Amino acid sequence: MDKVLNREESMELMDLLGLDRSAWGNIPVMRKAYLKKCKELHPDKGGDEDKMKRMNFLYKKMEQGVKVAHQPDFGTWNSSEVPTYGTDEWESWWNTFNEKWDEDLFCHEEMFASDDENTGSQHSTPPKKKKKVEDPKDFPVDLHAFLSQAVFSNRTVASFAVYTTKEKAQILYKKLMEKYSVTFISRHGFGGHNILFFLTPHRHRVSAINNYCQKLCTFSFLICKGVNKEYLFYSALCRQPYAVVEESIQGGLKEHDFNPEEPEETKQVSWKLVTQYALETKCEDVFLLMGMYLDFQENPQQCKKCEKKDQPNHFNHHEKHYYNAQIFADSKNQKSICQQAVDTVAAKQRVDSIHMTREEMLVERFNFLLDKMDLIFGAHGNAVLEQYMAGVAWIHCLLPQMDTVIYDFLKCIVLNIPKKRYWLFKGPIDSGKTTLAAALLDLCGGKSLNVNMPLERLNFELGVGIDQFMVVFEDVKGTGAESRDLPSGHGISNLDCLRDYLDGSVKVNLERKHQNKRTQVFPPGIVTMNEYSVPRTLQARFVRQIDFRPKAYLRKSLSCSEYLLEKRILQSGMTLLLLLIWFRPVADFAAAIHERIVQWKERLDLEISMYTFSTMKANVGMGRPILDFPREEDSEAEDSGHGSSTESQSQCFSQVSEASGADTQENCTFHICKGFQCFKKPKTPPPK
């Protein structure tokens, strides 16, 4: 090995390998150190390119020399090459052979006797070996409260602590300062080791800091952790038993460095208020709720909608939600807030459908309609009660004993008896079946479904009926073989495949998009269709069928009273509720709303007299504008069925009819078509 490299080259190679000079010639150790240094000094790893080249040159030269030294003929000679001893040739050969060894054979060193050699004896006990001090496994216990104990975490922090040896801490102090451009770094002594504390301008993972430091601590121990309480940790390192060795900022850190000025309190949207508004208005549309709530950000004192007072869902809640709506307008998660509110409405419906009886649910719906009537017909409302009573008169002429029809339907829907839950409205175009079905749907609350689509696409449409009080299968189409004017569709065929849904005997699976399936009894309801042929298997599912016929006087009267269509009075549940209040006795209503029904009967007696309503029906029968009559009050107030009386307005009509039954039909001023009750046009009372 002494001939492989000269002394300067061998010392340089050992320094580059990071090995002690005594390891020269230990090829396995040098090989391991060489591979390790290749990873550190490689330019792709951030190392020194010049050192890498020099180390490769010396190591390759050393390897080549070792191979030559291990060859069989290295250092040997042939006996025939040696001249005869004693001759001049032999002297010359001998000098040449020894000239390379002369400098290595001389050693200019003086040996001094040690104390152990002078005092020790031949039989003395050898000295004990020094015990190896174990490296620490963790930070000192008193610092644990300030450090993060997470081992495998992707959380990033900006303050770190490194626990290592004194020698490595000196190196890491400078390396970390350059590598991460630290805001602050300090080195503290503890026993024979050091603790580094530093703050970085950017956040890093603890594992990234640890991996970088491990490259510089091959044999030395290293513990790296994130710091949760920076100032408390730093102040602890500045007290005994720790000592400050050096720090990047003169005077160190102060407590106020970690206490920034308190920012202004961030205003946050009250999700609870938005949810409360959605529950009060029973809003199930995310975008509708978002739009209505954004309208609240305008000042209530300058709001035109509040001045008109035509939208109860707005002016009744504007002032309460004004402040929260201003914050809501600046929020970035408006849709998430509204989606949660709508989900809460659906959750409320789910709870009500499970815990409330159907009678209680209908009473709650009636209370909702009565509240709405109090608003729109109140002092701040803009609805005209007389126009809604005109709608009552028109609907009452649609079918004989309309109040009884509606009452029987409500009874059927509330009882919800299996196989006796669905009504069929059948008739030609423009006969009024859809108008009545829509009004009943609004009266009870529910959804309208379209089944005129392929059966495989019907699942999500049926899922609309989840947690609903009733449904309406609107305008169901058949084969169209009955008439060329009737279009064909899948409706009747699909309903025939949904017998379990119509019967209500067993629970069925309903599903919506992005929701789990819901198992429940499908809600009862109404089926409307034109004059299609209904199979016997489907006809057996209807407890009652009503055949509608178009009437010219109804169409003519409706065309003269456009407000009924413009304001959708005929399709409103409030119109049917007013019809029930006018015709049915108080005893037919639930006891929970008797007081409110009595109040409305009294109001109708004051504003709409029997004479006025009879004139409205007369105008309907003659195809005239319903409200085209002189506004004159009757001389006597007439009972509407509240208080001690159990009679209703329909009973009053029947008494009038019986009293005038002796008169012939020809003597009547007008006559409503066959099937309806005939009555005389009331005489105009004399002027007061």
Curated annotation (Swiss-Prot):
Keyword check for Disulfide bond, yes or no.
Answer: no
As one GO molecular function, the record gives:
helicase activity
**Protein name in the entry:** Large T antigen
Assembly and binders: Forms homohexamers in the presence of ATP. Interacts with host HDAC1. Interacts (via LXCXE domain) with host RB1; the interaction induces the aberrant dissociation of RB1-E2F1 complex thereby disrupting RB1's activity. Interacts (via LXCXE domain) with host pRB-related proteins RBL1 and RBL2. Interacts (via C-terminus) with host TOP1 and POLA1 allowing DNA replication. Interacts with host TP53, inhibiting TP53 binding to DNA. Interacts with host preinitiation complex components TBP, TFIIA and TFIID to regulate transcription initiation.
Where does the motif LXCXE motif lie? Answer: 105-109
- Keywords for this entry? Acetylation, ATP-binding, DNA replication, DNA-binding, Early protein, G1/S host cell cycle checkpoint dysregulation by virus, Helicase, Host nucleus, Host-virus interaction, Hydrolase, Inhibition of host innate immune response by virus, Inhibition of host interferon signaling pathway by virus, Inhibition of host JAK1 by virus, Interferon antiviral system evasion, Isomerase, Magnesium, Metal-binding, Modulation of host cell cycle by virus, Nucleotide-binding, Oncogene, Phosphoprotein, Viral immunoevasion, Zinc, Zinc-finger
Modified after translation how? Phosphorylated on both serine and threonine residues. Small t antigen inhibits the dephosphorylation by the AC form of PP2A. O-Glycosylated near the C-terminal region.
Q: How is the cofactor bound?
A: DNA helicase activity requires Mg(2+).
State the span of motif (Nuclear localization signal).
Answer: 126-133
> Which residues form the DNA-binding region?
140-255
Q: What are the Polar residues biased-composition ranges?
A: 642-658
Q: Where are the zinc fingers (T-ag D1-type)?
A: 266-358
